[in-house]
C-alpha cells in the first residue's frame, strides 16, 4: 500500500514552492504531480493543422515524492503515514502524530 495516493492533500517540504499545500493529481514511479504547483513555462510552436495556437503556456512539472509530505488538517502540519490492518483485515493508512485514519 502506498503512503501517498492520488487526491491526497500534501504539503511541499523542499524546493521553490516549499510550504505550499496542494492535491496530488497523478503519481508516476517516485514522482508526483500536484495541482497548480511546481509550474514551468513551455514554449509551444503554433500548428494550424492540429489547431494549436502558439505561445508560452504553464504546465505542472513532477516533484520527487521525497520532497512532499501528507498534510494533516487537524494539526495543520506535515505528518508521517503509517499502515495498519483493522479488525476486519483491511489495510488502512493513518497519521502517526494523532493516530487518526486517513480518509
Swiss-Prot record:
A single GO molecular function term of this UniProt record: structural constituent of ribosome
GO annotations of cellular component type: ribonucleoprotein complex; ribosome
Listed GO biological process terms: translation
Keywords, ordered alphabetically: Ribonucleoprotein, Ribosomal protein, RNA-binding, rRNA-binding
Keyword Ribonucleoprotein attributed: yes
InterPro entries attached to this UniProt entry: KOW (IPR005824), Rib_uL2_dom2 (IPR014722), Ribosomal_uL24 (IPR003256), Ribosomal_uL24_CS (IPR005825), Ribosomal_uL24_KOW (IPR041988), Translation_prot_SH3-like_sf (IPR008991)
Membrane-traversing stretches: none
Assembly: Part of the 50S ribosomal subunit.
Task performed by this protein: One of two assembly initiator proteins, it binds directly to the 5'-end of the 23S rRNA, where it nucleates assembly of the 50S subunit. One of the proteins that surrounds the polypeptide exit tunnel on the outside of the subunit.
HAMAP family in alphabetical order: Ribosomal_uL24_B
Entry similarity comment: Belongs to the universal ribosomal protein uL24 family.
Protein name: Large ribosomal subunit protein uL24
Organism: Vesicomyosocius okutanii subsp. Calyptogena okutanii (strain HA)
The gene coding this protein: rplX
Amino acid at each position: 500500500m502506498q503512503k501517498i495516493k492520488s487526491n491526497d492533500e500534501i504539503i511541499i517540504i523542499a524546493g521553490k514552492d516549499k510550504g505550499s499545500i496542494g492535491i496530488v493529481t497523478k503519481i508516476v514511479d517516485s514522482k508526483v504531480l500536484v495541482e497548480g504547483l511546481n509550474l514551468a513555462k513551455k514554449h509551444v510552436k503554433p500548428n494550424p493543422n492540429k489547431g494549436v495556437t502558439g505561445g508560452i503556456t504553464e504546465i505542472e512539472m513532477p516533484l520527487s515524492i521525497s520532497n512532499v509530505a501528507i498534510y494533516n488538517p487537524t494539526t495543520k502540519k506535515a505528518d508521517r503515514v503509517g499502515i495498519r490492518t483493522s479488525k476486519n483485515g483491511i489495510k488502512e493508512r493513518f497519521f502517526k502524530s494523532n493516530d487518526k485514519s486517513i480518509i
